[in-house]
């Protein structure tokens, strides 16, 4: 009996394939994740408009330890770039200090800010948590970035 099998990578991170994206340009799963983040950011924008002055910054963490495809998809929520939306990727080269400076500038400009940060965004050792094997728990970056930016 002959059996032919085909494997199809499915990841929402859109990080499978060659660096030039000649073999795979979008993985199954990424499109629905991109749409989800677009909807989330639109909803957060409406909530952010109604926040009091003391809660004028909304920080969201998106999956993507080493690739910023999902945080980048949040821009789909605002094609005309009217929202005070900032996106920070693990591979973007920003520091926590530059993120805070950019947020402060946006607060001075528009009075509010929405920050979408990749879970792999480097916050240095700030609030770093490890699992039982000593691996970094990347989900913690949302809390540390949010705490650093809001405070």
Tell where the protein language model's regions lie, with residue ranges.
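Accessory alpha-helical/coil subdomains and C-terminal extensions
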Residues: 1-6, 23-151
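Glycine-rich, charge-decorated loop segments at or immediately adjacent to ligand/cofactor-binding or catalytic sites
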Residues: 13-21
């Amino acid at each position: 009996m002959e059996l032919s099998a085909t494997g199809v990578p499915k990841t929402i991170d859109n990080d499978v394939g060659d660096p030039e994206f000649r073999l795979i340009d979008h993985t199954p799963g990424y499109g629905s994740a991109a749409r989800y983040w677009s909807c989330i950011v639109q909803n957060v924008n409406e909530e952010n408009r109604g926040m009091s002055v003391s809660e004028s910054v909304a920080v969201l963490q998106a999956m993507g330890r080493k690739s910023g495809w999902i945080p980048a998809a949040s821009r789909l929520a605002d094609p005309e770039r009217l929202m005070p939306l900032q996106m920070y990727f693990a591979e973007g080269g920003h520091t926590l200090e530059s993120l805070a400076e950019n947020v402060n500038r946006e607060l001075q400009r528009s009075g509010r800010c929405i920050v979408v940060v990749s879970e792999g965004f480097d916050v240095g050792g700030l609030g770093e948590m490890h699992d039982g094997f000593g691996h970094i728990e990347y989900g913690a970056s949302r809390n540390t970035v949010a705490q650093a930016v809001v405070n």
